[in-house]
Amino acid sequence: MKEISESYVPAVVENEVREYWKANNTYRETRKLHESGKPWLFVDGPPYTTGYIHLGTAWNKILKDAILRYHSMTGQHIIERAGYDMHGLPIEVKVEEKLGFKNKADIEKYGVAKFIEECREFALTHKDLMSEQFKDLGTWMDFDDPYQTVDKGYIEAAWYTLKRCEEEKMLERGSRVVNWCPRCGTAIADAEVEYWDETDPSIFVKFPIQGTENEYLVIWTTTPWTLPANVAVAVGEEFVYAKCRAVKDGKSEDLWIAKELAEQILKYGKYQDYSIIETKTGAELAGTKYISPLASAVPMQAQIEHRVVIADYVAMENTGMVHIAPGHGWDDYLVGLKENLPAVCPVDGNGNFTDEAGIFAGKYVKAPETNQEVIDVLGDAMLAVRKITHRYGHCWRCKTPIIYRATSQWFLKVKDIREKMLEEIADEVTWYPEWAGSARFHDWVEEARDWCISRQRYWGIPIPVWVCPVCNKYHVVGRYEELEQLSGQKMTDPHRPYVDDITIPCECGGTMKRIPDIFDVWYDSGIASWATLRFPEKPEDFGKYWPADFILEGHDQTRGWFYSQLALSTIAFGKAPYKSVLMHGFALDAEGKKMSKSLGNVIAPEDVAKQFGVDVMRQYILSANAPWDDMRFSLEGVKTNHRMFNVLWNVYKFPLPYMALDGYKPAAKDGVWDPSAVEDHISEFCREDRWLISRVNSLAEQVTKEMEVCNLHRATRPISTFILDELSRWYVQLVRPRMWLEEESVSKMQAYDTMYYVMRRLVTIFAPFAPHITECMYQNLRCEGDLPSVHMVDWFSGNDALRDPVLEEEMEIVQEFDEAVANARQNGKRKGRWPVGTVVVATDSEKVAGAVSAMNDMCCDRANARTVTVVKGVWDKLDWTAVPVMKVIGKQFGRDGPKVKAFIEEANGTKLKALLTADGKVSMEKDGFTAELTEEHMTFEEKMPENIFSSPMENGTIYVDVTLTPELEAEGYSREVIRRIQEMRKQAGLAVDAKIKAEVVIDDARVMPLVDSKHDVIETEVRANCLKIRVPDGETCSCRVADEAILAMDWEIDDLKVRISISKAE
């Protein structure tokens, strides 16, 4: 062991440690060390390789790294690879922005092959960039051989999985309504739709009832552009609808509206009067035929038989009648299936009306002017036009408003396996927290729809389906070898457009061509748990390690990665792909707002790490809150943790100079640290040593318990508390005098052994959370034959034989006593360095009395008191003041109440309390009025004797007598002088064992002799072999300090002027 730098400089520590890891290949060697251990498969949820990581990504990787390090140290064989999602719109949109493209037409014009190569380069470049950022967080994962969704082996795993879906008859092609991004020209998943508020028209339209005059159904919609695709009107089966004869400008119309909504709707339409002439239920209205008010503008509408249908999702709001366009809404689509309605969709992939939309053909449906044009064409059919602000969906990548559009797609029939999926997540998966699975994820799976896996884009895994245009037969290819055998062609790259050139002869004589679609990017990552094991290419690892033991991602992945994995695994293998899942929250700013550039509240993880250090950031992030709660990131919280790390460094640094002076070496066998030297002799150690050793073992047990259930916040917080409160503020203060002893001492050696033992255990416990500083400390502490890294050391879960719960409880009481004494001293304006004569502990608690009595010497030392005395109950030196309870007195004694009040206030409160305690009552007489009083008539307040100050502690009260005697004053001043000389030694850069000469000039003839009476004590404490204490006009110092002084300083000690000079002794 060697002495270390004075201050903790995170950047220096972390850079040196990373260089050490790199030079010694520590990550690989650590994994290799545990290859014979129990396998533990972790699958990294793959981030998109789109740019710099943000605070949420950093939190995610820090959580993963802490858990991986913990499981590695427990001796498990960790199987993991970093993962990257490198396909899909996240990459494509970034490349389109780079190339200045606005839509798919620009890509086609540029060339699909060139665009694919741009995407590949972008993804690989940013993968490398992100890997370095993750490494800078101290993350240990296999970044040299990550799983990448662009790799041939990974893509083959995706093909294999689809083949399994086809074999299980779970693959289906058909026309259904999907979320559609008109800019990207593709279907997108529900999980990829982002919602925010937008303002749209809110219109009420009159649909003429067939075969009537001036009789209408009144519908409401916020999407006028969908009216050219209207085929029906939905009503609530049991709702009551009114036929309202409404009058406006002298003309009347018969309008069908939900009865309880009619008055408000007619006000919107500015009708002057109305009467209800008929009512019907929705069931009675069902089947009513009507005519589209757009029949002349949209010829297709004239060919449709429009009618009223029943739908269970119709709400009693607006008009109570819903316009149905099965080609433009999922709920509408389901109604259409039930009622056999046509799903017309006169909108193309770019979001423009087709020729089927008549006069609207060619117009972009989400343009405000298009909605307005539809409104204008409706003309007299418009009852009212209003505005509404509501949540509307947008593409997650390009932020374009989505549309719902019926298109031909490929689906996995997830609805058919919902019950199996629910069984798996309930019975086979452990969730952290439990409600992540039983509530949030359960609810999502329970409502799962068939999964549209096809996307009409370019950069992705091509769907391995070849279709014959002659007979319409299709074939799903599961392996590259299979494709080459069927086609007779060699495949070099499974991406578009290269794979598109491969054709397969069909049995009918036609030529099968691959469909142009690629997989939904969620399909890509959904196969990660077996693709990372290189299955099906290398099936042996799949058989040994799958399913994954653990995965961890944010709560948005209940709709994303957790779900896509479960769906594909259940179809392909009949079971969940993971055994346990930790769901974490989102990273927000300190006020709970989402971080965004527009708000100016973005905090970059690299900036935090640069200012405070990676380990500090990790400890803050891990301890700030439960992993599954959203984290309100606070720089103040980071600063607090930074102070804790400085304290840890100082505690670690504290004994090293003394150990070096004494040539201390920890016990070792064959060069390996031997903790049994402490463990076998623990009973011989001082009480505070045994306590600290017990506490670090209790800490290890607690951290282990919390890590086993993913309570990382409850694992990390006690470590901070241990460092700050138990190591620094308590043990180091207790043991400091023993470290200063110059002579050989068993007690001093035991203090060294204790500090070494505790620091070795602490760096092990703290290693998963703060990997750099613990490695740095370990490298200095370790014995020659110890393992080369703290991260290779076996996890320490505590030694129960070294735990002493009784001693821990007693010491906790003494710590509470210490805090209470400090508070009482503060009240009495007596600093801790100044001794006091007496401290009294008044308590009814046997545990408090026992602890203070058993550790009386420690209590005296900590209180800086001559004596510490325990009294049972109330201290008899206290006086009491009686306070009348006027609320009770006034109610009972009425006009005589003032006499009772005066009696209580004038009486000796101490005697009154004694009488009440003895008899439960006291007789009074005042101005001829007599009565009996009880404790309900008065309360008592302590009346302190002079110079006595109190403070409560749990189950007791502390009383401190701050009266100064000459002896106490002498000791107080001497301690003040000692502290100043020690500070000057430090400023002068003197070694711990360096001898000095010192002169203390005190500007007070009364105080100087008091200080001089402690001459020998001061001389010993400051390691002076010559000390002179005098007043300014006294004799010249025989030590000749003033002439040789290396440092001279003026001090004020409670208004006392003191000049101190020190020089090196010869």
From Swiss-Prot:
Swiss-Prot/TrEMBL cofactor(s): Zn(2+)
Localisation: Cytoplasm
Alphabetized HAMAP family for the sequence: Ile_tRNA_synth_type2 (MF_02003)
Principal subcellular localisation of the protein: cytoplasm
Pfam families named in the record: Anticodon_1, DUF5915, tRNA-synt_1
GO biological process entries: isoleucyl-tRNA aminoacylation
Gene Ontology MF term list: aminoacyl-tRNA deacylase activity; ATP binding; isoleucine-tRNA ligase activity; tRNA binding; zinc ion binding
Motif 'HIGH' region mapped to chain: 47-57
One GO location term (cellular component): cytoplasm
Family: Belongs to the class-I aminoacyl-tRNA synthetase family. IleS type 2 subfamily.
Name of the featured protein: Isoleucine--tRNA ligase
Function: Catalyzes the attachment of isoleucine to tRNA(Ile). As IleRS can inadvertently accommodate and process structurally similar amino acids such as valine, to avoid such errors it has two additional distinct tRNA(Ile)-dependent editing activities. One activity is designated as 'pretransfer' editing and involves the hydrolysis of activated Val-AMP. The other activity is designated 'posttransfer' editing and involves deacylation of mischarged Val-tRNA(Ile).
InterPro entries: aa-tRNA-synth_I_CS, aa-tRNA-synth_Ia, Anticodon_Ile_ABEc, Ile-tRNA-ligase, Ile-tRNA-ligase_type2, M/V/L/I-tRNA-synth_anticd-bd, Rossmann-like_a/b/a_fold, tRNAsynth_Ia_anticodon-bd
Positions occupied by motif 'KMSKS' region: 594-598
EC number assigned by the record: 6.1.1.5
KW Ligase (keyword) present: yes
Oligomer status and interactors: Monomer.
Alphabetized UniProt keyword annotations: Aminoacyl-tRNA synthetase, ATP-binding, Cytoplasm, Ligase, Metal-binding, Nucleotide-binding, Protein biosynthesis, Zinc
Gene name of this polypeptide: ileS
Source organism per UniProt: Methanocorpusculum labreanum (strain ATCC 43576 / DSM 4855 / Z)
Binding residues for ATP: K597
PANTHER family attached to this UniProt entry: ISOLEUCINE--TRNA LIGASE, CYTOPLASMIC (PTHR42780:SF1), SOLEUCYL-TRNA SYNTHETASE (PTHR42780)
Taxonomy of the source species: Archaea, Methanobacteriati, Methanobacteriota, Stenosarchaea group, Methanomicrobia
CDD domains in the cross-refs: Anticodon_Ia_Ile_ABEc, IleRS_core
Signal peptide (residue range): none
The reaction(s) this protein catalyses: tRNA(Ile) + L-isoleucine + ATP = L-isoleucyl-tRNA(Ile) + AMP + diphosphate
Transmembrane segment boundaries: none
